[in-house]
Amino acid sequence: MGQCRVFPGLRTLHQWVVHAPSGFAPLSVLFENRYTMKKIAAVALLTLGAVLAGCSKQEPAAPAATPAPAAVTKIVVGLDDNFPPMGFRNEKNELIGFDIDMAKEAAKRLGLEVGFKPIDWSAKEAELSGKRVDALWNGLTITEERKQNILFTAPYMENHQIIVVAANSAIKTKADLAGKVVGAQEGSSAVDAIKKDEAVFKSFKDIKTFGDNVTALMDLTTGRLDAVVVDEVVGRYYVAKKPDVYAVLDDHFGTEDYGVGLRKDDTDLHGKLDKALADMKADGVAAKIAEQWFGKNILK
C-alpha cells in the first residue's frame, strides 16, 4: 500500500504529485483542472438554465385592439302611423306627414339613409332602448318623466292638449266634463296632462284609453265618449276635415313641446341632429315644410 505501481520508482502518492514523469501533469494540476472544469460546467449549466428559463417565459399577448364602432349610415325612426298630420298612411299606403318630411330632410343633411318603423306607441321607450328603432319622431312630447330614459333634441314645435267634443255637444269648458266619459290615446302625453289637472280628472265618470286617436274619435262620433283629449295638431286636422262632426273647446290641458327622442348614450347623433334642425329653421326649409302641412309656420 502507498506504492505507485504504474510508474516504478515513484513509491508514494506524494512522489507522484511532486515528481510526475515528463508528459504527465502533476495530480495537483489535474485535480485543479478538474475542479476548474466543474466550475465551468456549473456556470455553463446555470447560464443555460437562465437562457432556457427566459425562453420559457413568453411575453404576454398584446391585448386585442378594440374594433372601431361601425360608422352610422342609417337611422330608423319609430312612429305611430295613425297620427296625422305628423305621420300616417295615404291612400297608397305610403307613410307621409310633417314629421316624416322633417326626418327625411334632416337625414339628407347628415348624409344618412332614413327608415320608418310603425310601433306600438305605448311601448315606444322599450322599442328605443331595445335598439329596434334609433329615434322617436312623431309628435313626441318632452316631459320630465320621459327625460329619465330619453335624450331629447331641442324643442321644434309647441303643442296643446285640446278637448274635442261632438259638434252639437253641450260641453263648453273643462268644468262641463264632470260626470262624463273622456278618451285619450294610451301612453300619450294627453293622459299625463289630464291626470295633472287632478280636480278635473277626479270629476270624470271614467277615462278610457285607446291604441290610437282615430279609434277614440270614432267612439266620440258614436256617442260612447263625451270628449277626447288629443294633441292639437292631430285634433285640428280631423276637425278641419269634419267641422260638422267635431268641435274644439277653448279650454285645454296645458302647453307642451315636441322633440325628437334618442337613446341617452347616443350623444353624437344628438348633437348632429340638433344642428341639422337648427339649420333647417335658419334657412327656412322647416318653415316651408310646416306651411305645406299646417298652412302656416307653427314651429318654435
Q: Where are the model-predicted features located?
A:
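Ligand-binding cleft/hinge of the Venus flytrap
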Residues: 89, 103-111, 190-209, 239-243
